[in-house]
């Protein structure tokens, strides 16, 4: 019997997580951590409904990825079950390295290390725990797999990440301009020469998608009030980092202290991946 976990999502309805590798990924503490990370950071000061999390977004992107894989298969694009599982695992973990407050921590108390870099490090850490079961997912995430359209579904101009966050952020903020027709866009996807393409009759839907994304940046992501709050937070963190560098004892959670009292750069971060980092 096919066993699965069913999750009721307010944006897409029921999401099926099959028992096995994908279910183990969803249950992993590093992915569950995203339940405590708001998707839109400080945007809730402007849009009080924007309380949704990176975990919800990851599940939504997984749902869209499953739909996209099924749609591409119906058009004669052969995708092995192992490839489908791997790309679904990759999209589940694509934001696993995200910190709180959206992108505020990048290039502030963490220098030159993007959340994608941290996501990859954490994926490799989980892969070791799972005895290499995520090797193919990591290859797809790093764009090292021959079928490049799989990576483009995870990270590209028309990936499942963007299709979910526009719908989800629109839903929770109430800004209707982001409510794109994701189902229609997915139906228009195809593959040519191992690259993701769109059928000509889907161009209008893509134009709407691009317009919706631009409007969401204007109205939500770059809203002057939330940006001002982010600037104040960045100034506070940089000042705290400066005081920490002088050996001053600061009142902070163990997790924040780790970043304040250690220099985290792209080069140094590799040596920290074996540590059990504080989670509170």
Regions found by a protein language model. Name each.
Residues 206-259:
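A conserved active-site cap/scaffold subdomain adjacent to cofactor or substrate pockets
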Residues 78-91, 136, 140-144, 148-149, ...:
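Alpha-helical scaffolds flanking conserved acidic
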Residues 46-86:
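Alpha-helical phosphate/pyrophosphate-handling elements in metalloenzyme active cores
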Residues 125-215, 222-225:
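Histidine/acidic-rich helix-loop-helix segments that form or flank divalent-metal centers
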Residues 60-65, 114-127:
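An active-site-proximal "capping" alpha-helix that borders the catalytic cofactor pocket
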Residues 273-279:
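Conserved small/polar residues in nucleotide/adenosyl-binding loops
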Residues 61, 83-103, 119, 233:
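His-Asp-centered metal-binding catalytic motifs of divalent-metal-dependent phosphohydrolases/nucleases
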Residues 25, 33-59, 106, 147-149, ...:
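Active-site flanking loop/helix segments enriched in acidic
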């Amino acid at each position: 019997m096919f066993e699965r976990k069913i999750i009721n999502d307010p944006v897409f309805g029921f999401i099926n997580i099959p028992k096995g590798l994908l279910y183990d990924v969803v249950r992993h503490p590093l992915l569950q951590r995203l339940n405590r990370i708001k998707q839109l950071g400080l945007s809730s000061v402007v849009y009080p409904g924007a309380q949704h999390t990176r975990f919800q977004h990851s599940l939504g992107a997984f749902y869209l990825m499953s739909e996209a894989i099924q749609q591409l298969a119906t058009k004669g694009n052969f995708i092995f079950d192992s490839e489908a599982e791997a790309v679904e695992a990759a999209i589940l973990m694509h934001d696993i390295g995200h910190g709180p407050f959206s992108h505020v921590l990048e290039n502030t108390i963490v220098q030159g290390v993007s959340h994608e870099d941290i996501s990859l490090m954490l994926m490799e850490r989980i892969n070791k725990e799972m005895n290499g079961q995520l090797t193919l997912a990591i290859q797809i995430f790093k764009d090292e797999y021959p079928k490049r359209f799989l990576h483009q579904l995870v990270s590209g101009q028309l990936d499942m990440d963007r299709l979910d966050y526009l719908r989800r952020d629109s839903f929770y903020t109430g800004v209707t301009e982001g409510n794109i027709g994701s189902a229609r866009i997915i139906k228009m996807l195809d593959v040519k020469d191992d690259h993701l393409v769109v059928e000509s009759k889907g161009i209008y839907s893509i134009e709407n998608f691009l317009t919706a994304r631009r409007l969401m940046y204007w109205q939500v992501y770059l809203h002057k009030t939330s940006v001002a709050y982010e600037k104040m937070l960045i100034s506070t963190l940089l000042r705290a980092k400066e005081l920490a560098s002088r050996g001053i004892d600061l009142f902070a959670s163990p997790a924040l202290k780790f970043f304040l009292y250690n220099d985290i750069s792209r080069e140094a971060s590799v040596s920290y991946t074996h540590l059990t980092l504080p989670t509170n």
